[in-house]
Amino acid sequence: MAELGELKHMVMSFRVSELQVLLGFAGRNKSGRKHELLAKALHLLKSSCAPSVQMKIKELYRRRFPRKTLGPSDLSLLSLPPGTSPVGSPGPLAPIPPTLLTPGTLLGPKREVDMHPPLPQPVHPDVTMKPLPFYEVYGELIRPTTLASTSSQRFEEAHFTFALTPQQLQQILTSREVLPGAKCDYTIQVQLRFCLCETSCPQEDYFPPNLFVKVNGKLCPLPGYLPPTKNGAEPKRPSRPINITPLARLSATVPNTIVVNWSSEFGRNYSLSVYLVRQLTAGTLLQKLRAKGIRNPDHSRALIKEKLTADPDSEVATTSLRVSLMCPLGKMRLTVPCRALTCAHLQSFDAALYLQMNEKKPTWTCPVCDKKAPYESLIIDGLFMEILNSCSDCDEIQFMEDGSWCPMKPKKEASEVCPPPGYGLDGLQYSAVQEGIQPESKKRVEVIDLTIESSSDEEDLPPTKKHCPVTSAAIPALPGSKGALTSGHQPSSVLRSPAMGTLGSDFLSSLPLHEYPPAFPLGADIQGLDLFSFLQTESQHYGPSVITSLDEQDTLGHFFQYRGTPSHFLGPLAPTLGSSHRSSTPAPPPGRVSSIVAPGSSLREGHGGPLPSGPSLTGCRSDVISLD
């Protein structure tokens, strides 16, 4: 029970990081707040406290409270008998400093044997930094050194010192480049790098959390923070080498000091190193890539045959493969086609553009398959070099099953440019030219403005005026009907329209008028109707009522200047009305005669002369109807 209480005391002193490590070691869920994690850890301790879990708790506790090394004076204090003072005179016991009370003394003599101090981290671990393509290492100023946590404080601090030899100093000074209007820069630089303290493989740059660096007492600028991926996440900096040449003392006699502050993380140590490097450009790397040579084209042909080989298990067989000769980065024709050895595709990208892109922002990712394509794995494709040299007028090729290729030239389709449609006389003239009118027919046409003194907007080309005498036939009226026109006293009226010029037949025949089918089909019973006769004319504005009695017409006759007959719009309906009235109504009384104007045929058929009908009205003159 005493041992269980001690373990419980250790668990309750853990932070969130220790609780998560303990629960992860035991295979439990390690997500949640601190009180939830603590409850899970205590439940683990009570339910199944295996020896491995107990050892893990003790290990975490030793790391949480590292044992302080005691000096001779501290050991003499602990070896004094109880009740005695350090000077040996009797008196009250002097309190022992809390820092001298190690975890072993707090747990008792039984557990002191089990408590061992953590193994110290090596000062210079066997850490190897991953080489950078744009930097050539000239020398190592500080070997990879461990940034180990030395106390239980949240923030750690470490001090480092390095010095430059006269030869190194001379290399830096001779590489100085001063550009007009810009600050001086050095091609050979003093470079500071951070990484994880791991010896399994070459390490990439990795910044500790909350990193601050001072070089010779001056704060060193670091890369800016990246935008957080989620709310509440701790901002991080992009890990990359730091150029500390502007802050270094360029002297062979005065050393340089570096002070590093960072936040410690449980179970994770970091390493620091300083190098003397020479910065390279994209052009230099391209020359080095060319110096490596061009890959044999047979390798690419073998890859093509492998891709186009028919798979017996697949129902779809690929017989050809299209590849573009345009770079996916710059959308331009390839100059130096290259790809990584780890890429499984044939599509290449331009080496110069790829190196320039990574010089600005080193990602080293293939633009085709988005996989890692480091500089060391880049190769120049010899087959694509042959294709680019032999085919300069195409941007796409097609590979066959045997490894051969053929250019894919774009099909040039003759596209007829349709001019915008013209309106009015311009459109008519343009259509006449397009239809190939003979030169002798292209005479100057007399232009007549149809909008002058015209009241009709629906007619494009008005026909010539013709005088059409209209007659009407009397039909019997209904008994007691009122409002019919009488046949004996119906006065004649003239439909008046403004004077308009007429168009010659030669002009109408020369115009290329097209036949347009009707948008809506008309029935057989209304195809003979003259729809223009239903338009409103002056007689409808100023004349009396269409159907009225003889007495009322005589009474109101002096108020109207013009009197017109309604035959121009009731004519088409007269045959139908007449037949119905004859069959259903008797003859009208002799004292009162009603009639409806009804021509024998449609107005369109009667343009040439009088229409045949029944007896005409007495004292009625022919009406002049204009078809405008």
From Swiss-Prot:
Keyword Hydrolase attributed = no
Q: Provide the record's note on post-translational modification.
A: Sumoylated.
Region annotation Interaction with CCAR2: where it falls in the sequence:
1-200
Region annotation (SUMO1-binding) maps to 450-460
The UniProt entry's sequence similarity note says: Belongs to the PIAS family.
Assembly and partners are described as: Monomer. Interacts with PLAG1 and ZFHX3. Interacts with STAT5A; the interaction occurs on stimulation by PRL. Binds SUMO1 and UBE2I. Interacts with AR, BCL11A, HMGA2, IRF1 and NCOA2. Interacts with MITF; the interaction inhibits the transcriptional activity of MITF. Interacts with STAT3; the interaction occurs on stimulation by IL6, CNTF or OSM and inhibits the DNA binding activity of STAT3. Interacts with GFI1; the interaction relieves the inhibitory effect of PIAS3 on STAT3-mediated transcriptional activity. Interacts with MTA1. Interacts with CCAR2 (via N-terminus). Interacts with TRIM8.
Alphabetical list of InterPro entries matching this protein: PINIT, PINIT_sf, SAP_dom, SAP_dom_sf, Znf_MIZ, Znf_RING/FYVE/PHD
Q: In which tissues or organs does this protein occur?
A: Expressed in kidney, heart, spleen, brain and cerebellum; weak expression, if any, in liver and lung.
Q: What class of enzyme is it?
A: transferase
The listed outcome for residue 143 to Q is: Abolishes interaction with STAT3
Where does it sit, as one GO cellular component term? presynaptic cytosol
Localization terms from the record: Cytoplasm; Nucleus; Nucleus speckle
Q: Does the keyword Acetylation apply?
A: no
Q: What, per the annotation, is the impact of changing residue 343 to S?
A: Loss of promotion of IRF1 sumoylation, as well as of autosumoylation; partial loss of suppression of IRF1 transcriptional activity
* Protein name stated in the entry: E3 SUMO-protein ligase PIAS3
Q: Which gene encodes it?
A: Pias3
One of the GO biological process terms: positive regulation of protein sumoylation
The record, for Gene3D superfamilies, names: PINIT domain, SAP domain, Zinc/RING finger domain, C3HC4 (zinc finger)
The record lists Zn(2+) as bound by 343, 345, 366, 369
Q: Where is this region: Disordered?
A: 571-628
Please indicate the residue ranges that the annotation assigns to the motif LXXLL motif: 19-23
Q: In which pathway does it act?
A: Protein modification; protein sumoylation
Question: What does the record say mutating residue 143 to N does?
Answer: Abolishes interaction with STAT3
